[in-house]
Amino acid sequence: MIEQINNFFTIEMIYLWLNLGVLPFWIILFFFPHSFMSKYLVRSIFPFMIFSFVYVYLLYYFFISDFNFKNNFTLYLSLENLSDLFSENGFLIMFWCHFLAVNLFCGAWIVSDSIKLSISKFLTFFPLLITYFIGPLGLFIYWLIRIFFARRMSLYD
């Protein structure tokens, strides 16, 4: 049975499911940020548990296929080493899973913070869209909106 699971969940299939699987969470954040679905499905631990299970499966998958995990630590030594790591599908899919999880976490935080500060969902739509594609820039745009509409500037929560 494990062999069948390994044959079905190839790297390409996991990549496809990661990209399609994150879309419903983002759609809920975009269009229904104040709903119970948003509160209990997106702004909870649920999506990040899914990402964690995928990540653990990927670690298992690469562990049994003799992936060189020690090589991952060389990414901090030079830009060329990082570039070499991104040429490996194993590292690339783990990075992509991490990237999707962090951006979704940032989007969920934006929605939670905007609800707490009573910032309109129409004002948070654009920063959420930017966060979906470019996480840090979307957070910065939301922070600028937060300064003007929440009438307070705070560098920490």
Predicted regions and their residues:
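Hydrophobic transmembrane alpha-helical segments in integral membrane proteins
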Residues: I2-L23
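Short aromatic-rich membrane-water interface segments that cap or initiate transmembrane helices
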Residues: N6-I11, L79-M94
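N-terminal signal-anchor/start-transfer transmembrane helix
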Residues: W17-M37
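Membrane-interface helix-boundary motifs at transmembrane edges
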Residues: P33-I45, I115-I119
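Transmembrane alpha-helix/helix-exit interface in multi-pass inner-membrane proteins
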Residues: S52-N72
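Membrane-interface interhelical connector segments
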Residues: F67-L85
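Alpha-helical transmembrane segments of helical membrane proteins, especially in multi-pass transport
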Residues: E88-G107
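Hydrophobic, aromatic-rich membrane-embedded alpha-helical segments
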Residues: F125-F148
